Amino acid sequence: TRFSTVTGVQTCALPISTKGLEFMFSPDFSVFKGSGWVGILATAGGQVFFSLSLGMAAMITYGSYLSKQESLVKNSIIVPICDTIVALMAGLAVMPAVFAMGMEPAGGPGLLFVTLQAVFNDMGTLGPVFGFLMYFLVFIAAITSSISLIEGVASAYIDSKVAKGQSYNRKAIVGIVSALLFIENLPTCLNALGMPGGHLANIGKFCWLDFYDLLAEGIMMPLGSLILAIIVGYKLKAEWVESEVSLEGNSFAGRSFWMFCFKVTAPIGMALVLAGQLDAFFALGLFN
């Protein structure tokens, strides 16, 4: 948090940095014209999936480790608020620098490894120090994110063994899952984002990173979330949800609101996100 604050102050002090602040906080409602709102919804949905680790079993897995005394309703409010605050701090550390350096406000590796590096270069003798700290923290973030992904798969397999009354070796399971994920992600390294010098060809019109992004953000996450919302809203129903949320005397505040979200808002929203993601990736023209 302190590092983001220092970086944010530095970037906001750059020339023309106010354009970055305008980009972040001045809404452009013209993007909602026609079918534009679908694209905005799809983009926001993709951000939510990755930022909050939704649709990938991470939240469910970590949630199952919570003490029964914890309020699920309270935690479901605190987590998104804290995530939004951190995202805003990260935006303040990056977006002013994007415009100050005359770059396009795009996302992805270029924003992280090109734009931010330009900021550190402008910081003089402290630049290399802050640059090292920044990319070290990015490395730590990647490792901790990988842990959450591995934990979801590993715990599901362990739970299946426990349900059958079989023994298991957690270290071996985690090692196997980690090795499989490492092998699965090798193509993204060998492909080099589809640029010259890569050792692996693109898959169709997509580089391997975009292809995995399509599978994860474009299909699996919204589809899985859609199915889960339907299961919770229509198969498990309100009584089961309330029995879980109300453990140890916790109150199910906003019960009607949450169930409306499960039954109506979430399924419709996830269906639109799924359609919007597929439309964006394949230029299907579904909403033209």
Mark where each language-model region is:
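Single conserved hydrophobic/aromatic residue that forms the stacking wall/gate
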Residues: 1-12
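Membrane-embedded translocation segments of transport machinery
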Residues: 13-147, 161-173
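Hydrophobic alpha-helical transmembrane segments of multi-pass small-molecule transporters/permeases
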Residues: 44-48, 80, 132-142, 178, ...
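Transmembrane alpha-helical segments in integral membrane proteins
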Residues: 53-68, 139-155, 225-242, 281
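Transmembrane helix-loop boundary segments of multi-pass membrane transporters
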Residues: 74, 105-114, 130-138, 156-172, ...
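Membrane-embedded alpha-helical segments of transport systems
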Residues: 81-90, 180-187, 220-224
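C-terminal membrane-solvent junction of multi-pass transporters and transport-like membrane proteins
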Residues: 154, 161-178, 211-270
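Alpha-helical transmembrane segments and their membrane-interface junctions
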Residues: 184-192, 269-284
